[in-house]
Regions:
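Juxtamembrane helix-loop-helix connectors linking adjacent transmembrane helices
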Residues: 1-66, 84, 153-156
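Hydrophobic, lipid-facing residues on alpha-helical transmembrane segments of integral membrane proteins
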Residues: 9-25, 29, 64, 68, ...
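Membrane-embedded glycan transfer/ligation machinery
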Residues: 23, 62, 75-79, 95, ...
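Short helix-coil transition sites and intra-membrane helix breaks within transmembrane domains
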Residues: 66-71, 105-109
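Membrane-interface helix/loop boundary segments of multi-pass membrane proteins
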Residues: 69-94, 124-128
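Functionally important transmembrane alpha-helices
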Residues: 89-156
Protein backbone atom coordinates (compact mmCIF):
# COMPACT_ATOMS: atom_id res chain seq x y z
CA UNK A 1 0.00 0.00 0.00
CA UNK A 2 1.34 3.44 -0.90
CA UNK A 3 1.91 6.16 1.65
CA UNK A 4 -0.88 8.74 2.01
CA UNK A 5 -0.15 12.07 0.33
CA UNK A 6 -2.09 15.32 0.87
CA UNK A 7 -2.29 15.83 -2.90
CA UNK A 8 -4.38 12.72 -3.11
CA UNK A 9 -6.86 14.19 -0.61
CA UNK A 10 -7.26 17.16 -2.95
CA UNK A 11 -7.88 14.79 -5.84
CA UNK A 12 -10.63 13.06 -3.85
CA UNK A 13 -12.17 16.46 -3.04
CA UNK A 14 -11.98 17.42 -6.73
CA UNK A 15 -13.71 14.17 -7.71
CA UNK A 16 -16.45 14.78 -5.15
CA UNK A 17 -16.95 18.25 -6.60
CA UNK A 18 -17.07 16.69 -10.07
CA UNK A 19 -19.65 14.24 -8.76
CA UNK A 20 -21.82 17.14 -7.61
CA UNK A 21 -21.46 18.94 -10.95
CA UNK A 22 -22.22 15.79 -12.99
CA UNK A 23 -25.26 15.05 -10.82
CA UNK A 24 -26.56 18.62 -11.17
CA UNK A 25 -26.05 18.73 -14.94
CA UNK A 26 -27.60 15.30 -15.48
CA UNK A 27 -30.60 16.20 -13.31
CA UNK A 28 -31.07 19.44 -15.25
CA UNK A 29 -30.82 17.56 -18.55
CA UNK A 30 -33.40 14.97 -17.49
CA UNK A 31 -35.72 17.70 -16.28
CA UNK A 32 -35.22 19.76 -19.44
CA UNK A 33 -36.00 16.76 -21.63
CA UNK A 34 -38.97 15.85 -19.43
CA UNK A 35 -37.61 12.35 -18.86
CA UNK A 36 -39.19 10.83 -15.76
CA UNK A 37 -36.20 8.74 -14.67
CA UNK A 38 -36.09 8.10 -10.95
CA UNK A 39 -32.99 7.28 -8.98
CA UNK A 40 -32.91 4.36 -6.59
CA UNK A 41 -32.70 6.90 -3.75
CA UNK A 42 -35.91 8.57 -4.93
CA UNK A 43 -37.70 5.22 -4.98
CA UNK A 44 -36.53 4.52 -1.43
CA UNK A 45 -37.62 8.01 -0.34
CA UNK A 46 -41.10 7.50 -1.73
CA UNK A 47 -41.54 4.13 -0.04
CA UNK A 48 -39.90 5.11 3.26
CA UNK A 49 -43.07 6.40 4.88
CA UNK A 50 -45.05 3.32 3.84
CA UNK A 51 -42.54 0.79 5.16
CA UNK A 52 -40.15 2.52 7.60
CA UNK A 53 -38.67 -0.64 9.15
CA UNK A 54 -38.01 -2.16 5.74
CA UNK A 55 -36.39 1.10 4.66
CA UNK A 56 -34.10 1.15 7.70
CA UNK A 57 -32.98 -2.44 7.06
CA UNK A 58 -32.41 -1.58 3.39
CA UNK A 59 -30.32 1.45 4.37
CA UNK A 60 -28.14 -0.62 6.72
CA UNK A 61 -27.55 -3.08 3.89
CA UNK A 62 -26.81 -0.20 1.49
CA UNK A 63 -24.28 1.38 3.85
CA UNK A 64 -22.41 -1.71 5.06
CA UNK A 65 -23.10 -4.85 3.01
CA UNK A 66 -23.37 -3.36 -0.50
CA UNK A 67 -20.08 -1.40 -0.38
CA UNK A 68 -18.22 -4.42 1.00
CA UNK A 69 -19.59 -6.80 -1.65
CA UNK A 70 -19.19 -4.28 -4.48
CA UNK A 71 -15.61 -3.38 -3.58
CA UNK A 72 -14.60 -7.03 -3.30
CA UNK A 73 -16.24 -7.80 -6.65
CA UNK A 74 -15.55 -4.70 -8.77
CA UNK A 75 -12.19 -3.54 -7.38
CA UNK A 76 -11.00 -6.89 -6.03
CA UNK A 77 -11.83 -9.06 -9.07
CA UNK A 78 -13.16 -7.11 -12.09
CA UNK A 79 -10.58 -4.31 -12.12
CA UNK A 80 -7.50 -6.56 -11.68
CA UNK A 81 -8.92 -8.94 -14.29
CA UNK A 82 -9.36 -6.11 -16.77
CA UNK A 83 -5.81 -4.89 -16.07
CA UNK A 84 -4.46 -8.23 -17.28
CA UNK A 85 -5.81 -7.56 -20.77
CA UNK A 86 -6.11 -3.77 -20.96
CA UNK A 87 -3.99 -0.75 -20.20
CA UNK A 88 -4.64 0.57 -16.69
CA UNK A 89 -6.55 3.62 -17.95
CA UNK A 90 -8.90 1.48 -20.00
CA UNK A 91 -9.34 -0.96 -17.13
CA UNK A 92 -10.37 1.96 -14.90
CA UNK A 93 -12.87 3.24 -17.47
CA UNK A 94 -14.36 -0.16 -18.33
CA UNK A 95 -14.69 -1.18 -14.67
CA UNK A 96 -16.41 2.16 -13.94
CA UNK A 97 -18.87 1.61 -16.80
CA UNK A 98 -19.63 -1.93 -15.60
CA UNK A 99 -20.05 -0.63 -12.03
CA UNK A 100 -22.46 2.08 -13.18
CA UNK A 101 -24.51 -0.23 -15.38
CA UNK A 102 -24.66 -2.97 -12.73
CA UNK A 103 -26.65 -0.65 -10.47
CA UNK A 104 -29.54 -0.62 -13.00
CA UNK A 105 -30.25 3.01 -12.09
CA UNK A 106 -30.48 5.14 -15.25
CA UNK A 107 -31.45 8.14 -13.12
CA UNK A 108 -27.99 8.06 -11.52
CA UNK A 109 -25.88 6.43 -14.25
CA UNK A 110 -23.40 9.29 -14.89
CA UNK A 111 -22.89 9.79 -11.16
CA UNK A 112 -22.37 6.06 -10.63
CA UNK A 113 -19.80 5.99 -13.43
CA UNK A 114 -17.90 8.89 -11.84
CA UNK A 115 -18.00 7.06 -8.49
CA UNK A 116 -16.73 3.94 -10.26
CA UNK A 117 -13.87 5.95 -11.79
CA UNK A 118 -12.88 7.35 -8.40
CA UNK A 119 -13.05 3.96 -6.69
CA UNK A 120 -11.01 2.26 -9.44
CA UNK A 121 -8.43 5.07 -9.28
CA UNK A 122 -8.23 4.62 -5.52
CA UNK A 123 -7.73 0.88 -6.00
CA UNK A 124 -4.99 1.41 -8.56
CA UNK A 125 -3.25 4.16 -6.59
CA UNK A 126 -3.35 2.47 -3.19
CA UNK A 127 -3.05 -1.15 -4.28
CA UNK A 128 -5.88 -1.97 -1.87
CA UNK A 129 -9.68 -2.00 -1.83
CA UNK A 130 -9.80 -0.47 1.67
CA UNK A 131 -9.58 3.26 0.79
CA UNK A 132 -12.35 2.79 -1.79
CA UNK A 133 -14.39 0.78 0.67
CA UNK A 134 -14.24 3.64 3.19
CA UNK A 135 -15.20 6.19 0.53
CA UNK A 136 -18.01 3.93 -0.71
CA UNK A 137 -19.38 3.54 2.84
CA UNK A 138 -19.16 7.33 3.30
CA UNK A 139 -21.00 7.98 0.03
CA UNK A 140 -23.78 5.50 0.79
CA UNK A 141 -23.90 6.71 4.39
CA UNK A 142 -24.56 10.28 3.27
CA UNK A 143 -27.41 9.10 1.04
CA UNK A 144 -28.81 7.01 3.91
CA UNK A 145 -28.59 9.97 6.30
CA UNK A 146 -30.56 12.14 3.87
CA UNK A 147 -33.25 9.46 3.57
CA UNK A 148 -33.42 9.07 7.37
CA UNK A 149 -33.72 12.85 7.82
CA UNK A 150 -36.54 12.81 5.29
CA UNK A 151 -38.25 9.95 7.15
CA UNK A 152 -38.23 11.81 10.47
CA UNK A 153 -39.50 15.00 8.87
CA UNK A 154 -36.28 17.06 8.99
CA UNK A 155 -36.18 17.33 5.20
CA UNK A 156 -39.05 17.86 2.79
Amino acid sequence: MRRFRPLFLWLVIAFLALLYVVNSLYSALLEGLHLPLQTNDQVILESSRLAPLTTIVLLVLAVIVAPLCEEIFFRGFVFPGLRRGLATGWAIVVSALVFGLAHADLGSLPVLIVIGLLLALLRWWSGSIYPGLLLHILNNGISAAVILLYMVGRLH
